């Protein structure tokens, strides 16, 4: 399978690291490319933030970062995390030696953060940039601030949790492909089910990101638009099949059509229907 599949644990562990470990194991078992996390502290958002107490309960401490990174290595699945500040970038790159980073939609116009990542291009080789709430011009400006990054992926996203069907707007991916032909385009999904992800692959997405959960009815917005282990497994298998079905852009007969050529491209007798 060529498509990169990012299964985001995010905050869906509720601050229980035994649950987090179990999620990593399931993500690896069902074939994702990455298990993804979020690197921040509640204080990064400020004590007056409406969700401060929630962030305090689910923020992943440094020790657990290293534990999950080690577990990912043992389970043969990539470790990836979203960075939100220059400090969290420094931690991920300098301490954890991460060469790939995720930039969340909320940081699309945080040019100080993007510049700092760009200045670390000797160590940061890949960036996955989500574009929720963004415009084409804002994406273009973000690209300019990440000009040194060797592998920059642009992810279409709608920052609604969960995202209603009428707000998914997958055709925006085509607009992004036309506007930025030099960059691979992907899709970060908050929609119910896996249908939008599969449609995105059919439209040319090279990366699919979706939250991971044990049950979509668990409390919290990231669960409702998430995927269970079974859904992840089904999505990975379906993406692999879609890649085969898409084939190449060449319009020419395939070897399997030889029998049809021999038996159907024959002279027809002009009889009947008089």
Regions found by a protein language model. Give the residues of each.
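Catalytic cores and adjacent flexible loops of soluble metabolic enzymes
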Residues: 1-274
């Amino acid at each position: 399978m060529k498509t990169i599949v990012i299964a985001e644990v995010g905050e869906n562990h509720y601050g229980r690291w035994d649950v987090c470990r179990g999620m990593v194991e399931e993500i690896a078992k069902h074939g994702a490319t990455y298990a993804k996390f979020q690197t921040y502290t509640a204080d990064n958002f400020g004590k007056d933030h409406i969700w401060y107490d929630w962030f305090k309960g689910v923020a992943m401490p440094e020790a657990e970062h290293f534990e999950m990174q080690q577990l990912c290595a043992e389970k043969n699945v990539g470790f990836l995390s979203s960075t939100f500040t220059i400090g969290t970038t420094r931690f991920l790159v300098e301490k954890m030696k991460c060469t790939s980073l995720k930039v969340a939609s909320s940081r699309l116009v945080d040019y100080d953060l993007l510049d700092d990542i760009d200045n670390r291009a000797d160590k940061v080789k890949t960036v996955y940039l989500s574009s929720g709430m963004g415009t084409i011009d804002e994406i273009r400006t973000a690209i300019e601030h990440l000009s040194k990054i060797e592998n920059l992926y642009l992810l279409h996203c709608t920052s609604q949790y969960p995202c209603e069907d009428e707000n998914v707007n997958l055709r925006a991916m085509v607009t992004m492909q036309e506007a930025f032909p030099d960059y691979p385009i992907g899709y970060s999904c908050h929609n119910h089910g896996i249908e939008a992800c599969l449609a995105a692959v059919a439209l040319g997405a090279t990366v699919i990101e979706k939250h991971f959960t044990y049950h979509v009815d668990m409390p919290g917005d990231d669960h409702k638009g998430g995927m269970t282990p079974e859904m992840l497994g089904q999505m990975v298998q379906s993406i692999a099949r879609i890649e085969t079905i898409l084939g190449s852009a060449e319009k020419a007969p395939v070897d399997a059509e030889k029998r049809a050529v021999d038996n159907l491209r024959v002279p027809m007798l002009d009889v009947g229907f008089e």
